[in-house]
Amino acid sequence: MITRFAPSPTGPLHLGHAFAAILAHDMARAAGGRFLLRIEDIDRARAKPQWEAQLLDDLRWLGITWDGPVLRQSDRLPLYRDALERLWQRGLVYSCTCSRRDIEQAASAPQEGAPLGPDGIVYPGSCRDKGRPRPGQALPETALRLRMDLAATETGFEETGPAHRGWHEIRPETMIRAVGDVVLARREMGTSYHLSVVLDDAAQGVTHVTRGEDLFEATCIHVTLQRLLGLPVPVYHHHGLIRDDAGKRLAKRDNARALSKYRAEGASPADIRRLIGL
């Protein structure tokens, strides 16, 4: 078993991160496997070295050890572009210049409605024809979307998390209708979470992806990309989320739950485990 924890250095780690990291770490160790660490820093406007240093320190304080070097997405941008080039040459991605406002206006037209998918409003396809690759055209420096009508295939994945345990089938008609043409590269990043995460999990040999249940609906996108790119499909384990007193999912802006604050108040790693039920 190979698991991983993949935080973004865009703010302090909180109790929810501690739960995710400890769960992935302990699952791998209990199975005699490997636990890997990846820094997801493709959001170059928000990722900061000081947050990375803090999260590494917090993980060590929790007693979490990882195998091998830390993988940083910022070091892998050429590999993401290479995958996009291959998809572009196959006619599976297209250029999109729509703003968020454009998409909202098109999707709310009476004849369209506004269906919601894992990434929000399902893209209405405004740029699908005009943005498609032309013979000899280089990969454009715009947002790039996946042509789900060409990419989707009958497939599925195994889920071991408590809320969704079992085999989940993925059907092309559902992907086209309920997910749509997702963004694979944002103009300002040159990639996206969806593309990077599947390439990185394959590169690191991850066999079991553990993550919060808020990402369960995105798994169909990731498995579709894995099939499309000839990558292995791992087992998925989506766990429950740590929530605040009002029942809201913790976010990095919830500084009251930051691990650094608990540490400053004298909490021990064992105290953190008790707080999160591990």
Curated annotation (Swiss-Prot):
Tell me which UniProt keywords the record has, alphabetically. Answer: Aminoacyl-tRNA synthetase, ATP-binding, Ligase, Metal-binding, Nucleotide-binding, Zinc
Looking at the record's lineage, which domain of life comes first? Bacteria
The positions annotated for binding ATP are K252
Q: Name one GO biological process term.
A: glutamyl-tRNA aminoacylation
Entries under InterPro entries matching the protein: aa-tRNA-synth_I_CS, Glu/Gln-tRNA-synth, Glu/Gln-tRNA-synth_Ib_cat-dom, GluQ/Sye, Rossmann-like_a/b/a_fold
| Binding locations of Zn(2+) | C96, C98, Y123, C127
Q: Which cofactor does it need?
A: Zn(2+)
Q: What's the protein called, per UniProt?
A: Glutamyl-Q tRNA(Asp) synthetase
